[in-house]
Amino acid sequence: MDPRLQRLIDERDLRRLAELYAQGADRRDKALWSSIFTEDGLIEAPGIRLEGRANIVGALDAMATRYLATQHRVHNQVVQIDGDSAHGETYSTADHVAIGAEPRTVVTWSIRYQDRWRRVDGGWLFSERRLVIDWTETRRLD
């Protein structure tokens, strides 16, 4: 295959993982999240470090106890691919509606994910996601 075509396919596959991550987070879909991380995957966020696929997937239970709803959106993504590994940055915004907050509010996070991926058995998976939160905004819901 032409290397330029392979690069386009790889870039699309990496972006698709970011989109599936967002969908899995918002639907609290453990099977989906399990399918997009390596067994030794890592998520880091301010005050949080989750190591291993089981711990990452388990974080969805914690999200369900804190947030009535979330909505993650994937924006631009820049990646560097080197054979069967890749790294890059994925921009995102995520809305979080807290359980029990009165008045009801939504907190928006502006996120830059520092991502690493590995190709495993012919398909790409996240090996690391490090969240950098650039800013937050809290607003009341009507």
Label each residue range with its predicted role:
Residues 4, 8, 47-50, 104:
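Charge-dense, low-complexity intrinsically disordered segments
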Residues 87, 109-140:
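Short beta-strand edge/turn micro-motifs at domain boundaries
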Residues 94-98, 117:
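Beta-strand elements of well-folded, non-transmembrane domains
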Residues 100-107:
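Short, surface-exposed loop/helix-turn segments at secondary-structure junctions
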Residues 1-27, 31-35, 39:
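Short, low-complexity N-terminal intrinsically disordered segments enriched in polar/charged residues
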